[in-house]
Amino acid sequence: NVTLVAHRGMRSVAPENTTASFAEAGKHGYWGAECDIYRTKDGVWIISHDSHTYRMMDKSAFIEKKTYEELMDMNVDNGVNIDKYEDLKICSLEEYLDICKKYNMTPVIELKGKNNTEYYSEIVELANQFEVNPVYISFHIENLQTMRQLTQCKMYYLVQKISEDDIQDAKSIENCGIDFNGNKDKNFKSDIIKKCQDAGLELGAWTINEEDALQKLEQYGITLITTDCIEYAK
């Protein structure tokens, strides 16, 4: 009964947040693929966990200070099985949505930082073009509030440890759940999960890589699971 989301694509077999990792997630039958987005200097939405290219690319730059063409001059040079992927480039939001559509996978898009909220309509337009129904997630409640004015898609407020305030914030946005750190014991030591469920909030957990952690969450009725490596049983 578990709904599995591949964290940054299937990063256990291919470099994270790339066309390769998203395609692998699709081939392995994941319900969703999670990604992180930034906007380039010339207005192209691209996929990267970090605001700069230092960790994953062969040249270092801040994404929002470079044009898409400048970023395409770089290659991905880090990540699992990188040797298999020569000339792997930064992935655009369009490429990611195209892969999600091809594999009937739900796009799970993290709205990073607090910049560029005035351009969120571009994201919604792209999703509409590809006829996909994304889930939007963010650690910043304001980002979700802005996005809610543009789309009725499902949303989750990302938190480390669930607080009473988080419950109220999520409740203030229609069709918004809470996606919490499922490895933090404090989330299980109080009745906070029950309070979320009593408030009618859907819950998800991240980043779950151990089967026992998964089983614990299932006991609490939490079935939306973001993972680096857990797969559906063959």
Residue ranges and their predicted role:
Residues N1-K234:
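Phosphate-group recognition and catalysis centered on beta-loop-alpha active-site segments
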